[in-house]
């Protein structure tokens, strides 16, 4: 589960590339994950967090 945010659980989503000829090939959208050192359960850990959680303040960064 390496491409999943450890705070909100956001992971990859799936869909299709669609060309002008309406050909469809499968593709994947990944969340914008950053490795940060954050305080989780009272200890400092290196976790993968999406930028939405960082910006909205769901994570307290370690100093």
Curated annotation (Swiss-Prot):
Any GO BP = translation
Instruction: Tell me yes or no: is Transmembrane among this UniProt entry's keywords.
Output: no
Q: Which Pfam families match?
A: Ribosomal_L28
Q: Which GO terms describe its molecular function?
A: structural constituent of ribosome
**Which InterPro entries does the record cross-reference, listed alphabetically?**
Bacterial_rp_bL28 (IPR050096), Ribosomal_bL28 (IPR026569), Ribosomal_bL28/bL31-like_sf (IPR034704), Ribosomal_bL28_bact-type (IPR001383), Ribosomal_bL28_sf (IPR037147)
Write the record's keywords in alphabetical order, separated by commas: Ribonucleoprotein, Ribosomal protein
Q: Which NCBIfam families match?
A: L28
User: What is this protein identified as?
Assistant: Large ribosomal subunit protein bL28
The encoding gene is: rpmB
């Amino acid at each position: 589960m390496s491409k999943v945010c450890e705070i909100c659980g956001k992971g990859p989503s799936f869909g299709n590339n669609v060309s002008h000829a309406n050909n469809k090939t499968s593709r994947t959208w990944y969340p914008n994950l950053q490795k940060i050192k954050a305080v989780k359960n009272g200890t400092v850990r290196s976790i993968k967090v999406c930028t939405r959680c960082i910006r909205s303040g769901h994570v307290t960064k370690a100093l």
